[in-house]
A protein has these predicted regions:
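Juxtamembrane intracellular "pre-TM" segments in multi-pass secondary transporters
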Residues: 2-20, 197-231, 438
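Primarily residues marking transmembrane-helix entry/exit sites
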Residues: 15-23, 51, 108-112, 212, ...
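Helix-loop junctions on the cytosolic side of multi-pass membrane transporters
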Residues: 131, 135, 173, 177-207, ...
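Small-residue hotspots at the loop-to-helix junctions and early N-terminal turns
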Residues: 36-39, 43, 48-55, 147, ...
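Substrate-agnostic recognition of the 12-TM MFS/MFS-like secondary transporter fold
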Residues: 20-38, 58-76, 80-95, 110-169, ...
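MFS-fold secondary transporters
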Residues: 36, 45, 98-102, 118, ...
């Protein structure tokens, strides 16, 4: 059952020009990203059959974010978020063209260097895109906007990965890189059409970047709900090594080397298609209240573990694709709903730094997870199926943590206590108590 204030995807895009242009830019840019990813994976597998070589590419895609996020968060909260996104797109256009020189050289370090630069620029773009959404979308439409953004990522993953596999197989790696570079130009053009009407961001010019990070650190300590919400994607990233595992499992189940690029594309398409339906189904059948979002996240961690057990027992491309799709279906619920809850719980002046913090910790955990997959395959001699089994066990841990934290907070609220700014009478919807008891609870809070 949906809320009265709920809005559909098509209506949101039709009525909100600014968000529509942001969304168009996302569609084009992410299509190119997945073309790029499939081309890079195929190139590395052509140069090396080492699990660590693939893990190195994944770490090059992830770890630069950890180093760049402290700078990016401050920049996003100080400078026009629209300007940050356009500059990032234009610079990435130049960097991606550098991949055209890699195939002839056949040097892994050059691939890693280009990936590091490209991802560092993405470290500015993604927090800016996340932080600008509340200034373009009314509060009551934030869950829909986040669900649409998450579903778009999923569709572009499915379509872009499949297209990438076809393009690389038929036209070669160079064509995929050229198309990817052009998508950044188109994305920048769409974003340039967004009117500069962001909400004012508080800028204390006397503060340096370090002081501003201390400020947001104090905010997160005082607001444990926001802190834990910003760590949920890191919990999801515990099993992020699936990014390294997918190409390795594709090679394991496909006997023909000529089918490898297409097989990787199929698996990543399954990953994208699965992620489309998670938030959509929850929103359609259960609504989008904060309580629904909270418990959907908890359930999704445990259901994701079940899907990884299925992956661990897969022996062909189609059952493997089904397991990957199921895993990302539940992962998308965690991703989209945690972002929406952060938007609803965090003042605008902190959003850039909070999303940068979230991205930094998540990518650090994901980088470690991908390195762990490569190490387990190369050094420990584990099979891809055995690694997937360990992932199934690990993803249960953040689910237990979130369930325990949620139970603790709701118990405190039932007792009339506050947890940060979340109080028994809480407009964010964390309040688990019936409205008829508001007067009784408010009196209890005042007495304390």
């Amino acid at each position: 059952m949906q809320n009265k204030s709920s809005i559909g995807y098509i209506r949101l895009l039709r009525e909100n020009d600014s968000f529509r242009n942001l969304w168009y830019g996302q569609v084009v840019s992410e299509l190119g990203d997945w073309l790029n990813s499939i081309a890079i994976y195929a190139l590395i597998l052509r140069l090396s059959d080492s699990g660590m070589a693939m893990a190195g590419a994944m770490m090059a895609k992830l770890l630069p974010i950890v180093l760049i996020s402290p700078i990016a968060g401050v920049v996003v909260d100080r400078v026009s978020r629209k300007t940050v996104m356009i500059a990032s797109d234009l610079l990435r256009f130049i960097v991606v063209l550098g991949f055209l020189f890699v195939e002839g050289q056949g040097i892994l370090w050059f691939i890693y260097a280009l990936v590091i630069i490209e991802i560092s620029l993405s470290g500015f773009f993604e927090p800016a895109r996340s932080a600008i959404i509340p200034s373009l979308v009314p509060k009551e439409h934030l869950v829909t906007a986040n669900a649409l953004s998450g579903s778009t990522w999923s569709v572009m993953l499915a379509f872009g990965a499949a297209l990438g596999g076809i393009v690389v197989s038929l036209f070669g790696i160079r064509v995929a890189f050229i198309v990817d570079a052009c998508t950044f130009l188109v994305s920048a053009w769409f974003i340039s059409k967004i009117p500069t009407k962001e909400k004012p961001v508080e800028i204390l010019k006397k503060k340096n970047g370090f002081q501003e990070w201390l400020e947001v650190t104090r905010f997160l300590i005082k607001e444990p709900v926001v802190l834990v919400l910003s760590l949920l994607k890191s919990g999801l990233a515990v099993a992020g090594g699936i990014m390294t595992l997918i190409p390795l499992m594709a090679r394991q189940v496909l006997s023909k080397p000529s089918m490898l690029s297409l097989g990787i594309g199929i698996l990543y398409s399954a990953r994208g298609l699965g992620a489309v339906f998670g938030p959509l189904l929850v929103k359609r059948f259960f609504g989008e209240s904060a309580t629904v979002l909270h418990w959907s996240i908890a359930a999704s961690f445990f259901l994701k573990a079940v899907s990884y057990l299925f992956i661990a027992n897969s022996e062909n491309l189609w059952t493997l694709s089904f397991g990957v799709a199921a895993g990302t279906l539940f992962g998308s619920i965690i991703w989209v709903f945690s972002s929406a809850l952060i938007h609803l719980s965090t003042p605008d002046r902190y959003l850039g730094r909070v999303f940068s913090f979230e991205l930094a910790v998540m990518t650090l955990v994901m980088g470690i997870s991908n390195w762990g997959v490569g190490f387990a395959v190369d050094a420990l001699g584990l099979t891809s199926n055995q690694v997937a089994l360990w992932m199934a066990l690990l993803i249960v841990l953040p689910g237990l943590f979130w369930t325990g934290f949620l139970t603790f907070v709701r118990k405190k609220l039932q007792q009339g206590d506050c947890v940060g700014s979340a109080c028994p009478i809480d407009p964010s919807g964390f309040n688990p108590l019936p409205l008829v008891r508001e007067g009784q609870i408010k009196k209890k809070v005042q007495e304390k």
